[in-house]
Amino acid sequence: MSCTASYAGMTTPVKDKEGHGIPCLQPIDVVECTYQYFTKSRNKLSLRVGDLIYVLTKGSNGWWDGVLIRHSANNNNNNSLILDRGWFPPSFTRSILNELHGVPDIGNELEIFQAGLNLKLELSSNPVILSLEDFLDCCRDIEFKEQLAWSPTPVHERKGCCELLYYNQDLDVYCRTLPYLPQNQVETVNDYSSFPAISKIAGKKMPITSSPDLFYLNDCDVVYWYDLTRLVCHYVNLTERDLLANEREKFLTSLDLLTAQITYVYMLFRNLRLVEDSFKKTLKKLIYTLSRFSINANIWFHSTSFEEREAIASQKDPERRSPLLQSILGTFQKFHFLLRLLHFLSNPNELTILPQLTPRFFKDSFNTISWNNPFLRTVFNQHMSMTLPRQMIKAVAGASGIVAENIDEIPASKQGTFISSETSHHSPSAPFQRRRRGTIFSNVSGSSDESDTIWSKRKKPYPLNEETLSLVRARKKQLDGKLKQMIKSANEYLSNTANFSKMLNFEMNFKTYEEVSGTIPIIDILENLDLTIFLNLRELGDENRVFDEDVAIGDEDKEFLKHSLSSLSYILSDYFNMKQYFHDVVVKFIIVAQHLTLEDPFVFSPMQNDLPTGYYEPMKPSSLNLDNAKDKKNGSQNTDIQEEEDEYEPDPDSLILFHNLINQDSDFNDLKFFNLAHVFKKSCDDYFDVLKLAIEFVNQLILERENLLNYAARMMKNNITELLLRGEEGYGSYDGGETAEKSDTNAVYADSDTKDNDEWRDSQVKLPRYLQREYDSELIWGPIVRIKGGSKHALISYLTDNEKKDLFFNITFLITFRSIFTTTEFLSYLISQYNLDPPEDLCFEEYNEWVTKKLIPVKCRVVEIMTTFFKQYWFPGYDEPDLATLNLDYFAQVAIKENITGSVELLKEVNQKFKLGNIQEATAPMKTLDQQICQDHYSGTLYSTTESILAVDPVLFATQLTILEHEIYCEITIFDCLQKIWKNKYTKSYGASPGLNEFISFANKLTNFISYSVVKEADKSKRAKLLSHFIFIAEYCRKFNNFSSMTAIISALYSSPIYRLEKTWQAVIPQTRDLLQSLNKLMDPKKNFINYRNELKSLHSAPCVPFFGVYLSDLTFTDSGNPDYLVLEHGLKGVHDEKKYINFNKRSRLVDILQEIIYFKKTHYDFTKDRTVIECISNSLENIPHIEKQYQLSLIIEPKPRKKVVPNSNSNNKSQEKSRDDQTDEGKTSTKKDRFPKFQLHKTKKKAPKVSK
């Protein structure tokens, strides 16, 4: 049954484009047809595979009431979309309501129908008029479901006569005589297709449908029935027009394209299992009619001259045309009608997704380039092949008749034999050990288990740093000399072709291959650059990111990351385009060099396809009109590269050959005749330029990486730094200066002698066996007499050693013990060490000596360590419920009874920590009196105006700012730092880091205050004064060694709202801008803030407020980038010890950094405190608008900047400073196109020479 939108079941109103309310269908479910179901009943729906049915009612009898949205074949009907509603069996369908990602938007399709969208199918440019014989011939043996209705229509002819034609609205055809088709007999047998439990094709193979998430689709791909029908009709009309226009070449092209579309239609009906006799017969007649039309049209074009055809075709009266042309047009009329008939019989659901007609790559299964692209990698299911996506396997399995639920049971060997790029990076397979022939440009895709690409053979990627850039530059420098010599040889050939022998051509060819071989290291670097930081940046912008849930990213940080990703996307896109361009240039270089050895450089030209790429590809809907058809046939839609003009004289030999071909009337196929030496020189120039381009992009990526880390470090966002660098090669390396171990690794060879304390070792050998340490063999020593690692027992034994007291080891252990033990476990080890058991087989004298020289000293050391731990290193977060089981007070009382030194003090500390309570109050840092005064006696005085800020002397402002920030810095504890980097890694008892968080918050508030003070000022001259004023304050902060405030001010002046103020920066004198440049250079993040670190080392006993972002980065890198345990290898490679050895060297490095932090808290400033200024500073930093609001104010005071006046000429802060007024997309597109031209060997040469008669 059919009904229009106004009579369908309506529940929810929607509005059309004009705002009028329209009733809308509200389906309760959406199902997709999985098996065909045909019926002749008028109250039931016939279903085809892929049809979408909107369910309105689910009947209790097993039948469902549903709706299909279809297109009407009637071109005169305004409502070309109609509803087919009826009952259907649900067993032939499956619900897809929860799989909206793979089907069209339901609401959108229904709204399109309800709004009455008129999608007209231009099935013909002229009405189709058939004779009775032709109509009956076309419709013979065709079974119509209903009797065709004909309407008499009078038609006025030019002679004044009136002819009566009969018109059928469904088929959109006129017939000169009223046709009569006998009605089909009603079958009395049961309709087996009406039973839902039976399907004609159940269990057979199914076609792969072109779901949007399966293939890399072209925008012009045919997805729905309507698109295909419209495409076929377009070529039908185009072919007829070219025939009547007497354009032979265009007609043959149009006919070729029409034949291809009819082939697609045939493939489509076959894949959709439309096996009814009516479809088969109509398709056969359609193809037969097209063949007759093609033969007769070719006879027409070859039997008469152009002038005769022009005269006949120009006749407006059809009766005066030749019989052959009338026969051709009559045949084409039948073709038009058969196409209408096919469309009428199929009556398809316009929402049905068609099988993929043109070849396309599966998503995530092919990189589409010869290079490694880490942004295309996908994490797959562990049961699946590492390179075959699940959607692809499901589709192929479904097409092979495998049930989708059994996909996971398919063996991995049958799912694919590809090697993951990530796996091959770190685990090269055995076949890589063998030599094999291949090319560096071989593609990643393939069925082989071995990959020919260089990137798959390298274990570690190249880091984005200056060292990698130096490698590229050094290799390019080696190639430049050879390349210049080759260019010189080409120039000599151009100047004197007579003396240039064939041997020299071979020599140039040999040098080309030698040059390309020298390029392999550059290709290796480009292929294996470590882009982890940019991958992490993309993941940070993803809502479903896989990072730790406890890492919080603020709104301001999200805005920055989003802006950085947007800015970097163009750079990364250009980088990959450059890689592909590099590939094209090298390939072209090799081909041109091979041409030098050929006598006829055009010997391979016949191998080239005459048709342009994408010739048979479908067209865009906007191009489906007869006016734009010419562009398609000429191939202009597929060629977007303009031919370049070469600046050289035509080769005389080429001119002679060209003239001879013209005189002999030979087909030269528009080949461009060019000078090979000039082409070779041009290829050398392109090769030279692309090498420079590679260096430029590597340098750009290095700068962008440093910019990201610079922002995170300056704003002390160590969580962002950790997330950005996670997984990067070498992440976590810490340069601790003289105390750090050089060339340190996490792999230790147990058979090598790493102990560097010979005297102590000799003294241990001389001791009796019962006095020697039991676990000494399980200690690993570093080269500077430091413990590098060891087992838990060995570390505890060394901590309580009775002969040697390693003060640094003890401090490091007590600070970082929580990363090795739980508190209960640590104290249990100490109690066990206190209660040492004597060695076996000791005599009475040996036992007394063991008690005197080892047991009692060890007990004293245990009590001393415990007392020191509770007194100096105890943190409330260390408290655990299981500690009560240790009975520490009883242990201390036992030690008192045994007269162990320090046991009384130990009992006092235990009682204070666990019995008296007030743990938090006893250990919490106390705020200074001045800070309490500032909070208790709040003053409303603020630096809220430009005048009030400028009125404060820069020296006074810097002095008071230094006093205030140093007081906050002194409140930072080592536990604040450990909490910041460990978070909940070892225990969930850690809370916030109050001291450190307050220090970071103060610095960030100061940055926002500086930037907001500038952008809120409307007067340009006052803004310039404010900039100068803050620069002077930053300079005085540097003189006072207040690097924290200095960095906060610099970060504000280089932020986006301030940095883009072109006119304001112009008003600042150059000397002041140079001063800012010198300050910024001091905080340059290159080489891990090497300038700042050297400045910090030069300070000895002077007071200082260090920039804490560097410490946070060092702590984060050291903790996250080094493993907790060492890998112990024996002399034989590959033999690993199963014991876990604690990486104590990692803890030592952390303590080195903590000691430097504590060092600057010891020396205080001798400045006079001005409470008024301090109160004003503290109060002014509150309630500052967000950075986004500041940027809007910046756009108001200086809209549309054209050119930036940069206070610093370098680009250290490019990502942070970059204005959001990016270039237009058109500008970027044109630049990219000019920079990376497509590789075309013979189409980028000079035009064919002009021939003069």
Swiss-Prot record:
The organism encoding this protein is: Saccharomyces cerevisiae (Baker's yeast)
State where composition is biased (Basic residues): 1240-1253
User: What is the name of the protein in this document?
Assistant: Guanine nucleotide exchange factor SDC25
SMART domains under this entry?
Answer: RasGEF, RasGEFN, SH3
* Gene3D superfamilies in alphabetical order: Ras guanine-nucleotide exchange factors catalytic domain, SH3 Domains, Son of sevenless (SoS) protein Chain: S domain 1
Where the record annotates domain N-terminal Ras-GEF, the positions are 782-914
A single Gene Ontology MF term assigned here is: guanyl-nucleotide exchange factor activity
Looking up Pfam families in the UniProt record yields: RasGEF (PF00617), RasGEF_N (PF00618)
Q: Which UniProt keywords apply?
A: Cell cycle, Cell division, Guanine-nucleotide releasing factor, SH3 domain
Q: Which example biological process does GO assign this protein?
A: cell division
**Superkingdom of the source?**
Eukaryota
Effect of substituting A1048D: In strain: 0L136
